[in-house]
């Protein structure tokens, strides 16, 4: 039996306005999203008109038949895309007759190349939190919010060119064999090599959470993370630099933590979950101070099937459909009224979010990518 997913009030009130996916309870001081990130988001959408409400109801429950249409859907492959296929693509195809051709190499650069060459072959693309902002307006079609239920999407996750399709968390995962039965309380323990000896895993990417978690460990409140104090973050990272083991992709992070190559790791919650539940390794998640983020759906400018793409995106973000991939992978919905399987709810980032959770300021990170990346590369090679 399924039940309606009740997201924490903090999220519905705007805690996810910084968007871009229980191992220990956390006390929750009152915090709000950072001012710079909140300011980059549009105001809440106006109530839908009667005509818009009717169009939305139709696309959610009886999307138009479109036999003969083939949509090219690009995502990231693996278990993630398999969950999207089972949760969305296959049911939508059965309802509408739309066929899907898939690409498993979603890339911002590929979107840019296709659009600028005038040879657009992708129709719907799942992108990370670093894409789909106003800075990318020349590459994307504005979304059709007469169809997409903008008022039901977490605040800040439905903007002009992108709408969040799944949520996940950047979390602290730990190998219980390596921590001697002790439970790290947050990122400060990740940086405490005396209390918790051992190697530390982290993503080899400048904007994947390495600076944010260093600042959280150093006492910066989630609401005060941006603009990032890079000097302070690097000083904190220097305290564990000799013990850091970088991972280039999610599969490697799962392998490292499961094998005990690292005692703790900065990871995506789905990979940590898989290490425990699929690989059957002694791995747990500390949800305290997770960084909540999302993936988004976009339509490249010049898509040959723009209207069909809008219908599909609208259907995936409807309350009755949005949580379907979470039956196959522990990534959560963005629709606040989403219906979720109770067997998976406890493993979702969005369910475990509270006032201690942090949020990427996507607009700030995009605007400052060059400086952040330079600081990261200089630190790593010193």
Model-identified regions with their sequence ranges:
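Bacterial lipoprotein signal-peptidase II cleavage site
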Residues: 21-35
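Extracytoplasmic ligand-binding site segments that recognize negatively charged/polar headgroups
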Residues: 72-85, 120-261
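A bilobed periplasmic-binding-protein/Venus flytrap-type ligand-binding module shared by bacterial periplasmic
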Residues: 171-178, 215-219, 293-306, 316, ...
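C-terminal capping/gating helix-and-loop segments adjacent to ligand/active sites or protein-protein/ligand interfaces
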Residues: 323-382
